[in-house]
Amino acid sequence: MENRWQVMIVWQVDRMRIRAWKSLVKHHMYISGKARGWFYRHHYESPHPRISSEVHIPLGDAKLVITTYWGLHTGERDWHLGQGVSIEWRKKRYSTQVDPDLADQLIHLYYFDCFSESAIRKAILGYRVSPRCEYQAGHNKVGSLQYLALTALITPKKTKPPLPSVKKLTEDRWNKPQKTKGHRGSRTMNGH
């Protein structure tokens, strides 16, 4: 019988970032209690030899599964040492892969306190509102002018340690374009 291949999107991530993300997840599961209901599966509990860990995040009757891998083929850079992350949304027998932005938005719908658009109406009507969002990674759009004005009144409280963001876990910090700060150069080289 022929081998059957299944292709998955795996985000290449360096091992220190995966390690930091795992410790943030464990902290908020076991110490702060903000990730109540999440399930962490260790590498020795998985039958697959390349799976380093799995985090199962319940989202109503569905769940988000963030799987970290080790021992993968290395990328084109030296620091891509065979570590990776896949993000999957599962409901009963159906599963699909999602990108880090959508994963953060899904997490934000079910977990962590937020100062949402509905708070604008409550504030105008004179009700007390809590203008803080604990999970900023779940917002990927600019809010309305009223929303921005109300959030400008009270600065968001920084949580220590930060909440685990899937987007932050998978972001490519190695291949970002370099920014030059105030580089003047010689007058002959830049045309002056």
From Swiss-Prot:
An annotated Gene Ontology molecular function: RNA binding
Stretch list, region Interaction with host APOBEC3G: 40-44
Coiled coil: none
Entry keyword set: AIDS, Host cell membrane, Host cytoplasm, Host membrane, Host-virus interaction, Membrane, Metal-binding, Phosphoprotein, RNA-binding, Ubl conjugation, Ubl conjugation pathway, Virion, Zinc
Motif placement: BC-box-like motif: 144-153
Annotated segments matching region Disordered: 159-192
Residues spanned by motif HCCH motif: 108-139
Domain remark from Swiss-Prot or TrEMBL: The BC-like-box motif mediates the interaction with elongin BC complex. The HCCH motif (H-x(5)-C-x(18)-C-x(5)-H) mediates the interaction with CUL5.
Assembly and interaction partners: Homomultimer; in vitro and presumably in vivo. Interacts with viral RNA and Pr55Gag precursor; these interactions mediate Vif incorporation into the virion. Interacts with the viral reverse transcriptase. Forms cullin-5-RING E3 ubiquitin-protein ligase complex (ECS complex) by interacting with host CUL5, RBX2, elongin BC complex (ELOB and ELOC) and CBFB/CBF-beta. Within the ECS complex, Vif interacts directly with host CUL5, ELOC and APOBEC (APOBEC3F and APOBEC3G) substrates.
UniProt protein name: Virion infectivity factor
Species the sequence originates in: Human immunodeficiency virus type 1 group M subtype B (isolate YU-2) (HIV-1)
Taxonomic classification: Viruses, Riboviria, Pararnavirae, Artverviricota, Revtraviricetes
Gene: vif
